[in-house]
């Protein structure tokens, strides 16, 4: 775990907290993507998510400006869809994931995006940020979805787009910084704002003179009572 000791700094521990939901078919690599982002390494074995798992990490959008990302990893199986829907309401951002080596997973993205759009909450659901992410970009010999197809879909739906690899780490950090920066842009423009009772976007907290700040938080199984803080 990467840890920073911070002293003589009375600024906020983080300026904002963004809650993001990660959606897509089962086995597209959602959990592997999140584990690489939060742990800095590829998961050798990744069992299918049951219900919803929770991850978190602090990132710096610009020098001295930190945001905390809460990341909800949802199960792709149909039997868990009702559970997934309940998490949309408290999300400010949606990462729609497909596997570049599985065309069917790409064809299902439109349904996932529609479902998310219908269930998002907050004061301005239409202003919440969507981003399309293709996984397994290193597996060119098995590719079934061209980069241009993902790019076209994203442009049509007015989404950001990026391809990643949880095997090599290519573009993993960039994917999360990209969506966080777009959320921040909308906050700065007044399109998104924190409101009581909505967990999607929250203002930061202050820290004491000296604290130990963990940059990476490891996943917790929500079924085991993971907190939503």
Swiss-Prot record:
Gene Ontology cellular-component terms listed: cytoplasmic vesicle membrane; Golgi apparatus; plasma membrane
Amino-acid positions noted as binding GTP in the UniProt annotation, renumbered to this chain: 73-77
Phenotype upon gene inactivation: RNAi-mediated knockdown results in reduced survival in response to oxidative stress induced by sodium arsenite.
GO biological process, one term: positive regulation of response to oxidative stress
Modified residues (Cysteine methyl ester): 229
Subunit-structure text: Interacts (in GTP-bound form) with Ras association domain-containing protein rsf-1.
Annotated PANTHER family: DRAB11-RELATED (PTHR47979)
Protein name: Ras-related protein rab-39
